[in-house]
Amino acid sequence: MMSEGKPPDKKRPRRSLSISKNKKKASNSIISCFNNAPPAKLACPVCSKMVPRYDLNRHLDEMCANNDFVQVDPGQVGLINSNVSMVDLTSVTLEDVTPKKSPPPKTNLTPGQSDSAKREVKQKISPYFKSNDVVCKNQDELRNRSVKVICLGSLASKLSRKYVKAKKSIDKDEEFAGSSPQSSKSTVVKSLIDNSSEIEDEDQILENSSQKENVFKCDSLKEECIPEHMVRGSKIMEAESQKATRECEKSALTPGFSDNAIMLFSPDFTLRNTLKSTSEDSLVKQECIKEVVEKREACHCEEVKMTVASEAKIQLSDSEAKSHSSADDASAWSNIQEAPLQDDSCLNNDIPHSIPLEQGSSCNGPGQTTGHPYYLRSFLVVLKTVLENEDDMLLFDEQEKGIVTKFYQLSATGQKLYVRLFQRKLSWIKMTKLEYEEIALDLTPVIEELTNAGFLQTESELQELSEVLELLSAPELKSLAKTFHLVNPNGQKQQLVDAFLKLAKQRSVCTWGKNKPGIGAVILKRAKALAGQSVRICKGPRAVFSRILLLFSLTDSMEDEDAACGGQGQLSTVLLVNLGRMEFPSYTINRKTHIFQDRDDLIRYAAATHMLSDISSAMANGNWEEAKELAQCAKRDWNRLKNHPSLRCHEDLPLFLRCFTVGWIYTRILSRFVEILQRLHMYEEAVRELESLLSQRIYCPDSRGRWWDRLALNLHQHLKRLEPTIKCITEGLADPEVRTGHRLSLYQRAVRLRESPSCKKFKHLFQQLPEMAVQDVKHVTITGRLCPQRGMCKSVFVMEAGEAADPTTVLCSVEELALAHYRRSGFDQGIHGEGSTFSTLYGLLLWDIIFMDGIPDVFRNACQAFPLDLCTDSFFTSRRPALEARLQLIHDAPEESLRAWVAATWHEQEGRVASLVSWDRFTSLQQAQDLVSCLGGPVLSGVCRHLAADFRHCRGGLPDLVVWNSQSRHFKLVEVKGPNDRLSHKQMIWLAELQKLGAEVEVCHVVAVGAKSQSLS
């Protein structure tokens, strides 16, 4: 052991402390950097005593606990007088500095602490610690701490690197000290004091000691710990991680909780605040460090909640606190980008877990979303929006409100993990499959927190054999199948699951052992052992949050995947809005009507919505039998519910709000049930369901035309019942809810039946048949080379493109082939947009009326892309005066006015999300203006009138192409039909109507020819 008096005259060879095994290289590094022997003694990070460097670990383990510590009076913690004399910088250890340095800020010190400060300056200062920097306050706190012994790592090499870097900056530090005044009363900042003490404390514990496990952190910062260097007053601080620092910085300073949380790092900790060369700054930090360290160690040792920041006894004025700036915040975190130390693995493994924060200090209260990842921010915005609405909160009982409160009381990592799991499908998940490194490297404590709070279930509650089997992978199932000697242990996963479920239902042969578990219990036990630890979010809390999300996004159609995976689409919308990447039109939210009468009404609606989602998912996957069983179950539920007294009030709701009732959802399910039965060729059952749907007029009246049309087809084509078919057609044509294409379809079927010889005896039934005349339009035919292909996919054609000197062959659709034909015919401009072309012009010309104020209940939340009554008759009736006036203006407007109106809306609203407007439909505003100039007022006015009067039934069937000549303003509206394609009834009606309005329309038929034929004729 080295002599404690002074360093040896001649340094003996010693073992390198570096990780590297190249002793020569390590020795050269130390000699070149220090040019003398390393210090014989180091300061103990606990008691600040000078200890021989090689006895530091033994001192901490055996001797340090028995030493006396300097007791600090908490009342003395405060600011120091500014007239403290300067201290020679040579007495301060030279350490690492960052390449970029900023002048230190002026520090105003209070006059009440000058004497004590001067006394402390005279104390001995070690090369790495000031002797008066007390880390533990009393003996009891020390005894409660557990100090682990870890390797010193590459301490010598690190110190040498710091020495070289710091030596280069010493002159600049002295210049900073000479240029900064000794007193300034205008720049005292609270973050300077708080962060100076806290960061300095962590600096001394983490950097200058090899005992890097003596670091305490906020429980909400269970992130990956990657050390980084920060400079403050010629002291080096290795932060736990930049990610953890950023998390604590943002969470600890959220407006709603800044008074209740201890700040580890302030956003105003910038490098221009860190380079301090005067002893005044050091004394301030020494004085302020004591109280903060005391609190942090008390939190760890006693396992208690964090106390409010007011107990820190550091008082500053409001003006000083307000001196923080966002610019400083940005510069701080852009400059702190240091590389991790070589032995940071030890640090990652040895940092202890600290206590969870209370709601007041968890930084996760309602609306406080700054610093959270995108998914948690979106989730908190949804919660805040619904919780702030009194009508919505009446739909939750006290227990459910308590669940939301518990969520806010979770730590930040707990909230993150729960939202991640909430967005996944509701099923059991193996612990080994849970990997969210951005939340925590070790999710075990987070899962334990969620389990204790009642948000997660563990495998101890997994008792359903089918769920366990679904949890197993295919190899695991095969292994289990071999254990139970199944007939086909190497079969597909679903086959093995079915085989196990069948085996579990068999009765045991050994009937004498009544206490023996059945075969199902044995399979369950073996399967659970094979699956290992697993978790699933609890259904109760998940249902509460699902209903909250449902209320938030009630006006959006809930997609199948969203219903199964926690509304990912809605959360993504919230995120994009918060990021400024999505903006909705400006309108006034006006909620007058209560859609849900009580909590039970909302629960029934949510259950029906999820049932519809499950059925739609089964249909999309082709599982028709499964979809049939689900639909039958839903039908039974609806039959028990449809006469409930609470449903009678649904009839009084306007149609655009009635679609958010449980009866509407079950009616949609029964309509899907008809499709399922028809796919399974069960036409008798389908007819009965259609007749049942048509017997009521409360729910889904906009679907009545489709139901009548399908009923007539089933009776006529599949069941060959002519008389019921004719009666069905007659009743359907008399129904005012049967519109446009469906009405024309029923009429044409009636005409075919009337002319059929087999229906002569039913001619008397056609006497009341109303006449419908649809004018035919021009038809042209072109040819194209069809690309050979298999299956029923869309036709693909081969077309010659490019210049005549350099032709190229391309594959194209039938519409692109038609565009090429019209381009050669003199139409230099063309758009293939179908209905979106006209709906975009409709939205641009009537934007202000579509989103006008004064109509109750059509705008109910902040993320609507259209008014709720857009697809109902009430849209036109409630805006009739404004619409009639605008349509007349459009009809009579000259070309310049049309162009100006389109330009005005384009410039004011471009990019905003509106369901009617596709901003990418036109290549530019100029193209949109050119098109309205060609179409003219009468055509535009007529199209807009039809869309405004019945958007639900008129949005489909518009022509595929709009082509025009930019010079002559000559245009055509073209419907393109490929091989084996024909016009739909809606397309026939639109073509005839556009022709009446004065537009030149035609149908372009594309005939396929052989590959060796010409591309176009």
Curated annotation (Swiss-Prot):
Mn(2+) 1 binds at D960, E975, V976. Residues 671-696 form a coiled coil. A motif (KEN box) lies at residues 212-214. Residues 895-1007 form the VRR-NUC domain. One of its GO terms (molecular function) is 5'-3' exonuclease activity. Mn(2+) 2 binds at E834, D960. GO terms for biological process: DNA repair; double-strand break repair via homologous recombination; interstrand cross-link repair; nucleotide-excision repair. Changing D960A: Loss of nuclease activity. Loss of nuclease activity. Residues 11-23 have a biased composition (Basic residues). It is found in: Nucleus. Binds 2 magnesium or manganese ions per subunit. It catalyses: Hydrolytically removes 5'-nucleotides successively from the 3'-hydroxy termini of 3'-hydroxy-terminated oligonucleotides. Zn(2+) binds at C44, C47, H59, C64. It comes from the Eukaryota. Ubiquitinated and degraded during mitotic exit by the APC/C-Cdh1 complex. One of its GO terms (cellular component) is nucleus. A motif (D-box) lies at residues 14-22. A zinc finger (UBZ4-type) spans 41-69. Changing C871R: In KMIN; partially complement cell survival upon exposure to mitomycin C. Changing C47A: Abolishes interaction with monoubiquitinated FANCD2. Keywords: Coiled coil, Disease variant, DNA damage, DNA repair, Endonuclease, Exonuclease, Hydrolase, Magnesium, Manganese, Metal-binding, Nuclease, Nucleus, Phosphoprotein, Ubl conjugation, Zinc, Zinc-finger. The UBZ4-type zinc finger specifically binds monoubiquitinated FANCD2. Nuclease required for the repair of DNA interstrand cross-links (ICL) recruited at sites of DNA damage by monoubiquitinated FANCD2. Specifically involved in repair of ICL-induced DNA breaks by being required for efficient homologous recombination, probably in the resolution of homologous recombination intermediates. Not involved in DNA double-strand breaks resection. Acts as a 5'-3' exonuclease that anchors at a cut end of DNA and cleaves DNA successively at every third nucleotide, allowing to excise an ICL from one strand through flanking incisions. Belongs to the FAN1 family. This is Fanconi-associated nuclease 1. It comes from Homo sapiens (Human). The gene is FAN1.
